[in-house]
Structure formats: C-alpha cells, structure tokens
C-alpha cells in the first residue's frame, strides 16, 4: 500500500524538520 508508506514518510519528514526549525528559531532568538 503506497499510501501508508507515503503517509509514514511524511510523518518522518515532519518529525525531523519541525525540531530543526524550532532549534533554528531558538538560535536566532539567542543571537
């Protein structure tokens, strides 16, 4: 089922991109 794999792939990408964006925003605020 390609729909389920693409769904989990989207969750994996979101779970890796979101923390990176939060860390980037926190670093910008510290600067």
UniProtKB/Swiss-Prot annotation:
Keyword field: Chloroplast, Electron transport, Membrane, Photosynthesis, Plastid, Thylakoid, Transmembrane, Transmembrane helix, Transport
GO terms under cellular component: chloroplast thylakoid membrane; cytochrome b6f complex
GO BP of this protein: photosynthesis
Coiled-coil region: none
UniProt membrane topology term: Single-pass membrane protein
InterPro entries: Cyt_b6/f_cplx_su6 (IPR007802)
TM annotation in the entry: 4-26
Compartments in which it is found: Plastid, Chloroplast thylakoid membrane
A family per Pfam: PetL
Molecular function GO terms recorded: electron transporter, transferring electrons within cytochrome b6/f complex of photosystem II activity
Family designation: Belongs to the PetL family.
Subunit structure: The 4 large subunits of the cytochrome b6-f complex are cytochrome b6, subunit IV (17 kDa polypeptide, PetD), cytochrome f and the Rieske protein, while the 4 small subunits are PetG, PetL, PetM and PetN. The complex functions as a dimer.
Function, as annotated: Component of the cytochrome b6-f complex, which mediates electron transfer between photosystem II (PSII) and photosystem I (PSI), cyclic electron flow around PSI, and state transitions. PetL is important for photoautotrophic growth as well as for electron transfer efficiency and stability of the cytochrome b6-f complex.
Protein name listed in UniProt: Cytochrome b6-f complex subunit 6
Native source species: Illicium oligandrum (Star anise)
């Amino acid at each position: 089922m390609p729909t389920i794999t693409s769904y989990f792939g989207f969750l994996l990408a979101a779970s890796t991109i979101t923390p990176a964006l939060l860390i980037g925003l926190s670093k910008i605020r510290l600067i």
